[in-house]
Regions:
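Active-site beta->alpha loop and helix N-cap motifs at the rims of alpha/beta catalytic domains
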Residues: 2-183, 190-193, 197-202
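C-terminal extensions of enzymes
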Residues: 4, 298-361
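Glycine-rich phosphate-binding active-site loops on the catalytic face of alpha/beta enzymes
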Residues: 29-38, 127-132, 232-264
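Anion (oxyanion) recognition and catalysis
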Residues: 58, 221, 240
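Glycine/Thr-rich beta-alpha phosphate-binding loop at enzyme active sites
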Residues: 178-215, 242, 256-272
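Glycine-rich adenosine-cofactor-binding loop
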Residues: 213, 223-237
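Long, low-complexity, intrinsically disordered terminal regions
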Residues: 216-220
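C-terminal structured domains
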Residues: 254-317
Length: 361
């Protein structure tokens, strides 16, 4: 398909939810954290059960999925002890001594070991994602490591699309470093780049932050790469309007990248499940009512949350997919849909899109 892809960021145990979804599916592709494909360890409530049920559920629905190697979290001091037992069981967590660092990945043997470990959970995927470290600037030695990880991944990917992850902090989003990093990843052979910004609140993004994110998207797109905004919640459609190929989030969780490099709770935590209001980029609480209906035929929660958790999750995916496609089709003119939102934050996004349109004129 053309631009406007919506990627489901899978929760750890939602295989039944995925299998039971009716067609047409409310997402275009999916991303599974490598942690959610690890063997269940002894003592775990699911010990002995299949480790790959998320992948199997997606395969049963004919969905293209890829893996987030989720290796940046392994950089934090003490990460070996902070991991949950299942996460500690994954091959990338055992490939070389932790914590990961540019120094520990200086030798080619370590590069090979980490990439080959990451490949074990990607055998059924039609894309191949390279392991990665968080990067600060173009001079960061971790960027050189990421380029080497990408080169080795290219050798194992075969004819599969090669995915790079660009994880930065908000500081380096705003200082302009990330655009150059995206260009370097593209030059090393990445075909898709998932952008992850830590210490950033996407659903409360300021105009300055949206402009900075748009600049990263433009840099990668200009270099010939499909840019995907990862874990951005309802900001995703705005970023698609600026030129992103798509965005990834979940109906409830994975609405931002955890501020902690290695969060104790796993990084997918969320607050209250809200009902996404069409064309308003805001959410309603379970007890709220709305005069705006879901625009997708067959939605199980067309008139608001109604206290139905499952139906609200499905509706939210419908709305994210619809918004992604509209934003891709309308481009910067997508601002008109957001300009009358009750949210001042969202109206600020509309003004930012209008500003970009004036620049492009």
């Amino acid at each position: 398909m053309s631009r406007g892809r919506f990627y489901l960021r899978c929760e750890s145990d939602e295989w039944d939810f995925i299998k039971d979804l009716q067609r047409p599916l409310p997402f275009d592709a999916a991303v599974i954290s490598d942690r959610y494909l690890a063997d269940y360890p002894e003592g775990h409530a699911r010990f002995g059960e299949p480790r790959d049920r998320l992948a199997t559920a997606l395969d049963s629905q004919g969905v293209r999925w890829s893996v987030d190697p989720d290796t940046a979290r392994l950089e934090q001091k003490g990460s070996g002890k902070r991991q949950r037992p299942r996460a500690a069981n994954r091959p990338v967590a055992r490939a070389i001594p932790l914590p990961l660092s540019a120094q520990r990945l200086a030798e080619q043997d370590a590069i090979d070991a980490l990439v080959e470990a990451g490949a074990r959970h990607q055998l059924g995927s039609r894309a191949f994602a390279a392991p990665y470290l968080e990067v600060a600037t173009l001079n960061d030695p971790r960027l050189a490591v990421n380029l080497r990880l990408l080169a080795r991944s290219r050798e194992l990917a075969g004819d599969r699309a090669l995915i790079a992850y660009l994880q930065i902090t908000r500081r380096h989003l705003l200082d302009g470093s990330a655009g150059g990093v995206a260009e370097r990843l593209a030059g090393a052979g990445a075909e898709v780049i998932f952008v992850r910004v830590r210490r950033f609140e996407p659903e409360a993004a300021t105009p300055e932050e949206v402009l900075a994110y748009a600049a990263v998207i433009e840099a990668g797109t200009r270099a010939g790469v499909r840019m995907v905004a990862d874990c951005v919640g309802r900001l995703g459609a705005v970023l698609v309007a600026t030129g992103a190929d798509g965005f990834a989030t979940n109906a409830w969780r994975f609405r931002k990248v955890s501020s902690d490099l290695h969060p104790a709770g796993g990084g997918g935590a969320a607050g209250e499940l809200l009902w996404e209001v069409p064309d308003a980029a805001l959410g309603l609480a379970a007890s709220a009512a709305t005069s705006v209906s879901c625009q997708v035929e067959g939605c199980p929660a067309p008139e608001g949350p109604g206290g139905d958790h499952l139906a609200t999750r499905i509706h939210n995916l419908h709305e994210f997919q619809r918004a992604a496609r509209l934003a891709a089709a309308e481009g910067l003119a997508y601002a008109a849909r957001l300009a009358s939102s009750p949210s001042p934050i969202v109206r600020g996004w509309a003004q930012t899109l209008q500003q970009l349109a004036r620049r492009a004129a």
